[in-house]
């Protein structure tokens, strides 16, 4: 399904929070939406491997990487794992790498920067916790919608008219 965050903001202006504009698209899917699972990890993506091994149907992994752009948290291997397990997307308050490969995956990926340096994978961090960045507080279970214009968050799923297949929401 295609999402138009501008339309959703117009329709649901009282129900959504808008994340400050700092993210860029890196995945093959330019719009995506779903229920989030939060994770906080700094320059260590070991926990992300564990989380992305789970069934991701209808879900988005929201990663608070502390805004670090010194080392990439998301790489092509993690993106492939996410696709294999049906994840809708990944939003990372941090960096990604291997961007040409990331663009080939049918997966929404938004991050604040790209850098070739990878990070460690020791598994430090925590999941299903409250995280805050971009002027918004995120909880596991919230709903996130993203496109090239931006990212919005809602406590409840937004009702989308999917009667017309070609309609962009």
UniProtKB/Swiss-Prot annotation:
Protein name, UniProt field: Regulator of ribonuclease activity A
InterPro entries in the record: RraA, RraA/RraA-like, RraA/RraA-like_sf, RraA_gpbac
Pfam family, one: RraA-like
Recorded name of the encoding gene: rraA
Keyword vocabulary terms for this entry: Cytoplasm
Function: Globally modulates RNA abundance by binding to RNase E (Rne) and regulating its endonucleolytic activity. Can modulate Rne action in a substrate-dependent manner by altering the composition of the degradosome. Modulates RNA-binding and helicase activities of the degradosome.
Organism: Photorhabdus laumondii subsp. laumondii (strain DSM 15139 / CIP 105565 / TT01) (Photorhabdus luminescens subsp. laumondii)
Subcellular location as annotated: Cytoplasm
Family statement drawn from the similarity comment of this UniProt entry: Belongs to the RraA family.
Transmembrane regions listed in the UniProt entry: none
């Amino acid at each position: 399904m295609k999402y138009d965050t501008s339309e959703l903001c117009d329709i649901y202006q009282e129900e959504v929070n808008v994340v400050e504009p700092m993210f860029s698209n890196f995945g093959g899917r330019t719009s995506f939406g779903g229920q989030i699972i939060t994770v906080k990890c700094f320059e260590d993506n070991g926990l992300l491997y564990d989380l992305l091994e789970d069934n991701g149907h209808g879900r988005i992994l929201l990663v608070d990487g502390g805004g670090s752009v010194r080392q990439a948290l998301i790489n092509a291997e993690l993106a492939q794992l996410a696709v294999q397990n049906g994840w809708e997307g990944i939003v990372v308050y941090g960096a990604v790498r291997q961007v040409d490969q990331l663009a080939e995956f049918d997966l929404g990926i938004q991050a604040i920067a790209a850098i070739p340096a990878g990070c460690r994978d020791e598994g430090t961090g925590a999941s299903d916790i409250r995280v805050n960045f971009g002027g918004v507080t995120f909880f596991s279970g919230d709903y996130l919608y993203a496109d090239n214009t931006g990212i919005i968050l809602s406590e409840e799923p937004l009702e989308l008219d999917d009667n017309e297949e070609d309609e962009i929401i």
